[in-house]
Amino acid sequence: MYIIIMGAGRIGTLVARMLESEGHDVAIIEMNRERAREISEYVSGLVIEGDATDQKVLENANIKNADAFAALTGRDDANILACILAKHLNPKIMTILRITDPGKKKIFEEVKELKRYFDIVVSPEDIAANYIFRTLVTPGFDRVLLPREGAEIIQFQVNEDCEVAGKPIKELNLPKDSLIIAVYDEKGNLVIPSGDTVIPKKGQVIIFAKNSALQDVKKIMEKKREE
């Protein structure tokens, strides 16, 4: 994919480097001259000094042939305008809008007249706050938040002391709003599990669970074997 990123701040830079590491072509548009020069040393793609709300700048970035455009600056108004302009120049492009005010996020997701300009709306601040909250409320495991679904993908380390070790999944009595989606043994071999899959005595278990089921899942997966 060819992706254009607006903004070379911490988020924009991190996203660009992650995309490049996966083999995608990336261009970054940054207004600040010093920052544009600095970021060019860290990414292999095109870095353009300019304003992404300017049509000529987007055209110089080859917007008409881009697969996606991500407006990731800390300025909501500029991000909004740039996404609208990107859609105007390339109606098939996927747009990702960063909103710093979580309160505005629902407006862009629910108002039909706005949704056609913004394919994905993200609020890093909202995600970070959610992550901190969930970690405080249910600490103790690695997680990936899925705010829209009200769920998380969580990872548990398993060893011989865990009560679940050596048991088939169908005997774990996990809550109905949870599902084991992957099991790794000690050597890192992946198993897509069924009910008969046995939890290894040492390894990792990946579980998809709704927030309402997290506490029960945690109790089951972290319970120690009685001596």
From Swiss-Prot:
Residues 141-223 form the RCK C-terminal domain. GO terms for molecular function: potassium ion transmembrane transporter activity. The keyword Protein biosynthesis does not apply. NAD(+) binds at residues 7-11, 30, 51, 73-74, 98. Signal peptide: none annotated. SUPFAM superfamilies: NAD(P)-binding Rossmann-fold domains, TrkA C-terminal domain-like. It comes from the Archaea. GO terms for cellular component: plasma membrane. Disulfide bonds: none annotated. Keywords: Ion transport, NAD, Potassium, Potassium transport, Transport. Pfam families: TrkA_C, TrkA_N. Part of a potassium transport system. This is Trk system potassium uptake protein TrkA homolog. It comes from Pyrococcus abyssi (strain GE5 / Orsay).
